[in-house]
């Protein structure tokens, strides 16, 4: 007799000596049995055929759940490795994890894989999946596993296993003639893998170290159903059209100059105009929210990074030290220690708290060249950083204020679908259980008080405090992590921060880190792709272009330009000797919201013929009316003109 407890608290008894998750799923219903791909026994993910002990708490993982998708993708990486070994027996397998929306596997092979190779690999995967080969787990002593893979010529696998402590067992998974090292769990058979596609190939260094050999990495995606796969591929096609790197070049917004080094962004005049609008809006909102602004250095003595702990815990992401006056200095990867030094510059009373200090601070972090990607992964970027120093009693109110400010700013940019995660105390942490519980509850209450739904990430907090993450959803359904609100019990301790409390004693302040956009560069890239470059008028680098029809209107066109510029609008003029239709098409492709055409009729009447980039004509309007219209639209931060409902 085996009795188990289900997630809803109910129990089930089975009159048999051994029991598996697969049998439990089948006993509950045919639908669950069909959708099941793994189980959770006493909090541990296991294969469907793993034995379930008496009294265990059991849950079934289905293919459409986040956990199920991760297992499908990991199993698909094994299927791809099996296909590669079938087609290219000399290739050595290395590692192949599941990643967001897919998977990859790295191979040591004599040449890069071609597009034809990738097609052949995918076709082979489909044949292997149709065989519906059983996926079997076995456990082997470490030394025996090393010898096993060495005998097969899989030296990378042998190296990985060799790093495991002696005397430990390792688990292997086999399907057909293919065997791989893996913790699992995996799908019960290859037939469970129905919706997948090989996407692309590239290079990757072994263990991510440029001193090691370059391997061949193949990426793929896998989903529970063909419909989900099709929807994802459609989304990826749309994302390719919206690629911020291409649009950034087309609209002359920014560049990455390899002569200066990878991952370093150069903002061109038009991109700088948008950045200035973003920065000014950010500052205005923060002034309204009671923040003060700081300006701090870009480098600091290495001793500061020793005190903050960055030298011990973050050195791999920091650039190498430079020597100044026989002392080591390093460029900053974060702004936090600088704000703390300003706090410590004098003593503080509880009456002064909270301090809300913000800085658009540029930081520098080392990234492998292969990881760099447009504005999304760079080596130098500007954080919309702020730190709040407050008392324990002020935490909840400050978090509420931060959430209000965050959502207000994100909504203004056109984002309205949010996913909020609350990450709690991990196994290893600093600070007492009492302060963790109190702070976590304050974060939870702040979220609930704003009628926001959220997901708890148990144990997912940093070692120094709980946090809130806010993800936004863009116009094609992709989710982006942007905003983070992080409590910190560590740095106030390391820097011996304090304030005099109402009782006359010294107390530690609570430190709250928060970035609402994350970094200006990455957020700008998200905006470019969200709007596909069709920015709302208030964000557009060029809000209007004045186009003359012939030379006879040049002087009048300049008058119109001057009136618009005087009103603070971002306007350009096109006096080229080209047909007006050509000019309109060109500036429409440049996504300019307003095209202002002036001919003899407009010059004589003191008007402007107004066209929207959607193709709609508003007819001829007096100059002052046009100025007022554009100023009002820009000031309102409308996401589209009332007559211009073209979607990005």
From Swiss-Prot:
A GO biological-process term: threonyl-tRNA aminoacylation
Binding positions (Zn(2+)): 336, 387, 513
Entry's EC annotation: 6.1.1.3
Catalytic activity: tRNA(Thr) + L-threonine + ATP = L-threonyl-tRNA(Thr) + AMP + diphosphate + H(+)
A Pfam short name: TGS
Keyword presence, 4Fe-4S: no
Cofactor info, note text: Binds 1 zinc ion per subunit.
Cofactor(s) the protein needs: Zn(2+)
Keywords: Aminoacyl-tRNA synthetase, ATP-binding, Cytoplasm, Ligase, Metal-binding, Nucleotide-binding, Protein biosynthesis, RNA-binding, tRNA-binding, Zinc
Compartments in which it is found: Cytoplasm
SMART domains, per database record: tRNA_SAD
Molecular function, one GO term: ATP binding
PROSITE patterns attached to this UniProt entry: AA_TRNA_LIGASE_II (PS50862), TGS (PS51880)
Family annotation (InterPro entries): aa-tRNA-synt_IIb, aa-tRNA-synth_II, aa-tRNA-synth_II/BPL/LPL, Anticodon-bd, Anticodon-bd_dom_sf, Beta-grasp_dom_sf, TGS, TGS-like
Enzyme type, top EC level: ligase
All residue ranges annotated as the TGS domain in the record: 1-62
Superkingdom of origin: Bacteria
Family as reported in the entry's similarity comment: Belongs to the class-II aminoacyl-tRNA synthetase family.
Subunit structure: Homodimer.
HAMAP family: Thr_tRNA_synth
Function: Catalyzes the attachment of threonine to tRNA(Thr) in a two-step reaction: L-threonine is first activated by ATP to form Thr-AMP and then transferred to the acceptor end of tRNA(Thr). Also edits incorrectly charged L-seryl-tRNA(Thr).
Alphabetized PANTHER family for the sequence: THREONINE--TRNA LIGASE, CHLOROPLASTIC_MITOCHONDRIAL 2, THREONINE-TRNA LIGASE
Protein name per its UniProtKB record: Threonine--tRNA ligase
Species of the source: Magnetococcus marinus (strain ATCC BAA-1437 / JCM 17883 / MC-1)
